[in-house]
Amino acid sequence: MAKLIIINSEKGEKVETHEDIFKLSNLQQREIYAITNERTKSILLNQTFYTILDIENEPKDRVAFDSYNSLFPTSIFSYNRQDRLFGTCNHVLDNNIHYSFALFDSMVDNLSTYLPNDWNIIKIPDSIDYPIGNDLLFYVFDNLVHMTIDQFVNSEEKQMNTVPKCKESQDRIKEVFTDIMSHLYMPAIDYDPQSYNYRISRREIGNLVRDQVFSLVKGHIHLIGPEMESLRNIIMFLHAGNSITFHTIDTSKKSNYIKELEFNKKTKLTMANVLINQRKNMNNFFKGLIKHYMTYGIPNKVYYIGAYPSYWLELITWVPFNIITYDPKYRHVDNDKIIWHDKLFDRNDIETIESKSYIYIDIRTDIRKLDMTKKQRIFKEEDDMIVEIATKLASKQCTVMFKRKIFPGNNMSFGDPLFHPKLTQLGREYYNCITTIVSPSIYKESELYSLLLSARSNNVSNYVYGGSKFDQSSIVNYNSTVIALYSLSNTVNSLETIEHAIKFNHIITFPHRTDRGDWRNIEELNNLSPFQNKKRQLEFEDWSIDPKNYAMKFGCEIVSESVFLQLGHSRALIPDLYNHIISIRMEMPLFYPDRFFSHIGIRQPSIFKRDSYMTSRLSAYISRQLTHSIDLSVLKKNHFEGYSGHLIAIETSFSSLVFTMSPYRWLIRAKKSLTKSKIRDKFKIGDGQPHTREEFENTYDYLKINRLVNSTFHSLLLG
């Protein structure tokens, strides 16, 4: 169970030794005040997955604690030791809708008309309150706008990178606003995968897990079903000199112009439709960049020709390189990685481009006030110029992603014609991406339009990353690692495909079979199947797993997401059963010491059950002793030893303990302790001594005679 530990000097649990930390871990409450010393504070920070607020010594922690008190209770997401994000927002108390999403910046004035008159939209990029405006503004716009896609495509608002003003009455605006605010602030009293509370928890812990996973793996990976949320991680991973085989699914479907035009005329506009043009350029930029990494490795320089206005540049402050942009229309970009040249890029500039650089070209001449004849002439001149620049750059071993136009008759495409999915405008554009000089292929106008129309139904991940579907025939090198985060568990994948991936080194996520009740009270199953009931979560259906059965069959380490984050500096304090489970098969740092995934909280399930029914701790000792003798005086003589309470916890509560430790790792460590006379561990938490083989045998006798479990790890531990 993730805990919030508030370190102070005035009140709380005295935590002076590593044994005190073990005792603290078994306390049942989530929020604990603690009085620590430097040593125990360091252990809590580094060797637990708890969220730590040192309100005595850390100014940022004091600020966070004040915010937490105003929002209590709420989820907390820690991106490092001191930068945090809370799971709700109190800016609404001042009638402010707080957002951080940069693509809204050019739309704020018109978006404000979708809110009640006495409400404001404010941007706070680095607030520790959750930016609910990033979600709320989608909802109010989608429910109040009256335009169709086709009307928006031909509107002035589209040209101005904004949205149409709201034409609804204030009564209707207030009605929609009340609906969404009621949803966002609905108190969570049970597991509800459709709630905003759940959505925030899953979104943010997923981001933390992605960061942690990509910091662990090196070399070559097979990445199954990456979403666009992984884009930053993927670019940083490739920029570090690693490589990726992508596995995605192409969802393109054949269509025709009349059908797609009818769709645009009948379909109501959404915010996703509004944003697609900005996202198109960003996705095209990164599609070409990924191609460069795969071909040449790290680019010497990165260029963007035809950059205005590109509001998406504010979304990518994280890129590990500068982007040199060219456009005579200047815009100040709130991103210090952007170096803007407010001039045209012409043929003379080609010589200044370094070899093995990456260039994205999206030159667009303003033709809005021209007649059709002039437009066609300019389109052709522009396309010829872009092709000339691109091919000359490609001759310098540069990767060039560049805009093209579809013309009547035959068209020359340099490589495959590329069409971004889900575009609103049935225009005449496509893209080429080349890494060297290539001979053009001839496409008829009708062929290109057919490809454009079918691409509308494809998914963005397949377009940007490429790759093929992962299945049981996929070949994985044994020196590679399979990464499947929130993807392989989807029921579109067969169990045979999933088991194929599990065979290799991997990090794979699954939902836990249990999502209601208390994590400390998960009953053992009567079957041995690792895969259990299918789970509906948000818009997806996934295979869920039973951690104990899974670990027994596949021999993998199994922990919850919150526990997994202990491998780095990020932390997540969320409802326990919102956690997904992470399956790990790979070499891990410091596997045997207590540095990572130690047995903190191992007593929580037994204490929870004992306290729930007021059962004396003595009952457990007597019950075990009666397995071998009715002489209970032996208990005192042996100081209540002779059995392993920890092993009982592992065997009876394995599927619970994944929420606080790695029970599988405990078994491997216990097995090793049987062959080592004494193991020194400077990271040790808890004063307990290693058990003997006899004590483990006694414990298994007790479990068997009392029929406490259906299956055990006896052969793993003692075989």
UniProtKB/Swiss-Prot annotation:
Annotated compartments: Virion
Catalytic activity: a 5'-end diphospho-ribonucleoside in mRNA + GTP + H(+) = a 5'-end (5'-triphosphoguanosine)-ribonucleoside in mRNA + diphosphate; a 5'-end (5'-triphosphoguanosine)-ribonucleoside in mRNA + S-adenosyl-L-methionine = a 5'-end (N(7)-methyl 5'-triphosphoguanosine)-ribonucleoside in mRNA + S-adenosyl-L-homocysteine
Keywords: GTP-binding, Methyltransferase, mRNA capping, mRNA processing, Multifunctional enzyme, Nucleotide-binding, Nucleotidyltransferase, RNA-binding, S-adenosyl-L-methionine, Transferase, Virion
EC supergroup of this enzyme: transferase
Main location group: virion
GO function terms (MF aspect): GTP binding; mRNA 5'-cap (guanine-N7-)-methyltransferase activity; mRNA guanylyltransferase activity; RNA binding
EC numbers for this chain: 2.7.7.50, 2.1.1.56
Cellular component annotations (GO), alphabetically ordered: viral nucleocapsid
BP terms from Gene Ontology: viral process
Pfam families: Rotavirus_VP3 (PF06929)
InterPro entries per record: VP3_Rotav
Family affiliation: Belongs to the rotavirus VP3 family.
Function: Multifunctional enzyme involved in mRNA capping. Catalyzes the formation of the 5' cap structure on the viral plus-strand transcripts. Specifically binds to GTP and displays guanylyltransferase and methyltransferase activities. Together with VP1 polymerase, forms an enzyme complex positioned near the channels situated at each of the five-fold vertices of the core. Following infection, the outermost layer of the virus is lost, leaving a double-layered particle (DLP) made up of the core and VP6 shell.
Assembly description: Interacts with VP1. Interacts with VP2.
Name of the molecule in the record: Protein VP3
Organism: Rotavirus X (isolate RVX/Human/Bangladesh/NADRV-B219/2002/GXP[X])
